[in-house]
Amino acid sequence: MKDRLISAVARPEDADVDTSLRPRLLAEYIGQEKVKETISVFIQAARGRGEPLDHVLLFGPPGLGKTTLANIIANEMGVSIRTTSGPAVERPGDLAAILTSLSQGDILFIDEIHRLSRTVEEVLYPAMEDYALDIVIGKGPGARSLRLELPRFTLVGATTRAGLLTSPLRDRFGVISRLEYYRPEDLVLIVNRSARILGIEITAEGAFEIARRSRGTPRVANRLLKRVRDYAQVRANGVITCEVAVEALKFLEVDPLGLDFADRRLLLTIIQKFGGGPVGLETIATAVNEEPETVEDVYEPYLIQLGMLARTPRGRVTTPLAFRHLGLEPAREETDQVSLW
């Protein structure tokens, strides 16, 4: 799963390119119009009052620009940003060290904020609400609590699983925005912008071909652009035309809907081994040699969005669209099952 070209999960190779391609201001940020409008209004209001921005929660599938937006917020507010992640903040002391290093108005960005431990969360509550740290000195009956004042800061939290956030944490965010999958026309603009920055010659048709196979995700679009560039350099004249893009993506085993070998294997497993379903998540995971969480969080969302897979009370079911895409004839009972749910 980690080696999938079309995975929206960040890979080490993405880091350098992401930095060079990442927009710095809201005016440069393509797509997510509602989110941009909301954040822009609150940024302007906070700057007009000379106050830090209220705490912001960004949630949605991976690769849609949550980290980019956090950096844009810092740039628009004219402040510094400190970046960490839920798994990296293991102990309350780790969080206390970060919070005490912030200056007035700074942004603290916590990626995967749903993975913070409960003990760390409890330290975060007064920091978000009262801009203070409650520190316990000593142990036993002689222990006493000391409150340490913090500079007013803005916490920007990002998560792909908003449902795992506790209510006390979620309720302390003043601005909550959901990022959606990108439209093909927005991805075309992103591909063209990235191509200009990277010095890649690409036609409008070539950009569209890459965009429509990018699973609605800018990170995937930029990754595909780089790989198609390599193919064009070796197998063509270096220019990404529609024909070159189609050939390159076929070579990379990314089909016109953005599915790769792993997606097709999952669908074929359900169809060929379990008659199209319904079949349970644990059974599917065992059959494809993946963890259930990987199947549920990585594979299923895009297949469900395309309408090729359905979650029902009895289990997962492949739809007639999945059969047709794989060149198979939908079974009669498959059609009946999907219509019932």
From Swiss-Prot:
GO terms for molecular function: ATP binding; ATP hydrolysis activity; four-way junction DNA binding; four-way junction helicase activity. One of its GO terms (biological process) is DNA recombination. Residues 1-182 are annotated as: Large ATPase domain (RuvB-L). One of its GO terms (cellular component) is Holliday junction resolvase complex. Mg(2+) binds at residue 67. It is found in: Cytoplasm. Residues 183-253 are annotated as: Small ATPAse domain (RuvB-S). ATP binds at residues 21-22, 63, 66-68, 129-131, 172, 182, 219. Pfam families: AAA_lid_4, RuvB_C, RuvB_N. InterPro entries: AAA+_ATPase, AAA_lid_4, DNA_helicase_Holl-junc_RuvB, P-loop_NTPase, RuvB-like_N, RuvB_C, WH-like_DNA-bd_sf, WH_DNA-bd_sf. DNA binds at residues 311, 316. It is an enzyme of class 3 (hydrolase). It catalyses: ATP + H2O = ADP + phosphate + H(+). Its EC number is 3.6.4.-. The keyword Flavoprotein does not apply. Keywords: ATP-binding, Cytoplasm, DNA damage, DNA recombination, DNA repair, DNA-binding, Hydrolase, Nucleotide-binding. Residues 256-341 are annotated as: Head domain (RuvB-H). Has 3 domains, the large (RuvB-L) and small ATPase (RuvB-S) domains and the C-terminal head (RuvB-H) domain. The head domain binds DNA, while the ATPase domains jointly bind ATP, ADP or are empty depending on the state of the subunit in the translocation cycle. During a single DNA translocation step the structure of each domain remains the same, but their relative positions change. Belongs to the RuvB family. The RuvA-RuvB-RuvC complex processes Holliday junction (HJ) DNA during genetic recombination and DNA repair, while the RuvA-RuvB complex plays an important role in the rescue of blocked DNA replication forks via replication fork reversal (RFR). RuvA specifically binds to HJ cruciform DNA, conferring on it an open structure. The RuvB hexamer acts as an ATP-dependent pump, pulling dsDNA into and through the RuvAB complex. RuvB forms 2 homohexamers on either side of HJ DNA bound by 1 or 2 RuvA tetramers; 4 subunits per hexamer contact DNA at a time. Homohexamer. Forms an RuvA(8)-RuvB(12)-Holliday junction (HJ) complex. HJ DNA is sandwiched between 2 RuvA tetramers; dsDNA enters through RuvA and exits via RuvB. An RuvB hexamer assembles on each DNA strand where it exits the tetramer. Each RuvB hexamer is contacted by two RuvA subunits (via domain III) on 2 adjacent RuvB subunits; this complex drives branch migration. In the full resolvosome a probable DNA-RuvA(4)-RuvB(12)-RuvC(2) complex forms which resolves the HJ. This is Holliday junction branch migration complex subunit RuvB. The lineage of its organism: Bacteria, Bacillati, Bacillota, Clostridia, Eubacteriales.
